[in-house]
A protein has these predicted regions:
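Active-site nucleophile elbow and catalytic-triad environment of alpha/beta-hydrolase enzymes
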Residues: 15, 177-194, 200
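Conserved alpha/beta-hydrolase "acid-adjacent" motif
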Residues: 211-218
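Catalytic active-site module of serine/aspartate enzymes centered on a nucleophile-bearing elbow/loop
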Residues: 234-274
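Active-site nucleophile loop of the alpha/beta-hydrolase fold
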Residues: 122-133
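Conserved alpha/beta-hydrolase
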Residues: 47-66
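The serine-hydrolase catalytic nucleophile loop
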Residues: 34-44
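Short beta-strand/loop motif that positions the catalytic acidic residue
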Residues: 198, 204-206, 210
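Gly/Ala-rich beta-loop-alpha elbow adjacent to hydrolase catalytic centers
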Residues: 99-103, 107
Length: 274
């Protein structure tokens, strides 16, 4: 990530998990590969302002070093998601799941496996397909999988964010362990054929200029194969991949909050009198 812009001292960034209080509805927020809960925090704050309980999970191996990310797999990431889901389930309110990039794929797996326990799903620039050159590269180097925890792929320029100020302060590793990249491709390949099993209401938000997870390939596949009878696509015009912190983050937060708010539990008469 290039931090050589004007400000030599970017502000301190909180990359830790967060739980924001609310009532009547809980939301599980899942960040992407090499990311941190920070990239879901603005969205979480806006949802909490609407009195939605929000839990931003930290996926296993993240918020640490590239070496730490190379020691885990998609099974560990999904375990982090399930732990977060169980934490919210204890409150007894309806739960929605919201995932960015790889987090969108993990959200889809949770929706498939939890069924009616989830009220709705939101996928933000989900990583079901990488660009063709990246897919071909990973396929070509797959025979080196035994060395995957010692091989790193460089992300030139850091995170794919259009807004320069947001890109400058965005935390995250710009070295991607080959093992983690292969785990993402395996996760996506396992979840894609099961999208038809998702029947919860679904919202998909994706940027047309996304170069990490191409808009046409991903949105066409998801909208065609998602089993939900109610599904909606929102296309962003200015942002790149990390849409929760990019130029249109306010619109993303507004669209998500409006969509999930209708799943809030209706207070009973006795509860309303308390």
């Amino acid at each position: 990530m290039d931090r050589s812009d004007d400000d030599p001292h970017p502000p301190a960034i909180d990359t830790s998990e967060f739980l924001l209080d609310g009532s009547g509805l809980s939301a599980l927020l899942i960040h992407g590969l090499t990311g941190t809960p920070y990239e879901m925090r603005f969205l979480g704050d806006q949802m909490a302002a609407a009195s939605i309980r929000v839990h931003g999970v930290k996926l296993a191996g993240h918020s640490e070093s590239p070496e730490a990310l190379g020691t885990v797999t998609d099974a560990n990431w999904y375990e982090s998601v399930v732990d977060g889901f169980e934490r919210l389930r204890a409150y007894g309110d309806p739960i929605v799941v919201i995932g960015l990039s790889m987090g969108g794929v993990l959200a889809a797996r949770l929706a498939i496996e939890q069924g009616e326990a989830l009220a709705a799903i939101v996928m933000l620039a989900p990583a079901f397909f990488l660009p063709r050159p990246a897919r071909m590269l990973l396929w070509a180097i797959r025979p080196a999988a035994k060395l995957a925890n010692r091989v790193y792929l460089h992300k030139p320029g850091g995170s794919e964010i259009h807004d320069a100020a947001a890109r400058r302060i965005h935390p995250g590793n710009h070295l991607l362990p080959l093992k983690a990249a292969l785990s993402l491709t395996e996760l996506s390949a396992n979840v894609r054929p099961k999208l038809g099993e998702i029947d919860q209401p679904a919202l998909l938000i994706h940027a047309r200029k996304d170069r990490t997870c191409p808009f046409e390939k991903n949105t066409r596949f998801v909208m065609r194969h998602l089993g939900s009878s109610r599904k909606r696509l929102v296309a962003l015009e200015e942002s790149y991949h990390v849409i929760t912190v990019d130029s249109e983050k306010e619109r993303v937060a507004r669209e998500v909050t409006e969509f999930v708010s209708e799943f809030r539990a209706v207070p009973t008469a006795s509860a309303a009198r308390c």
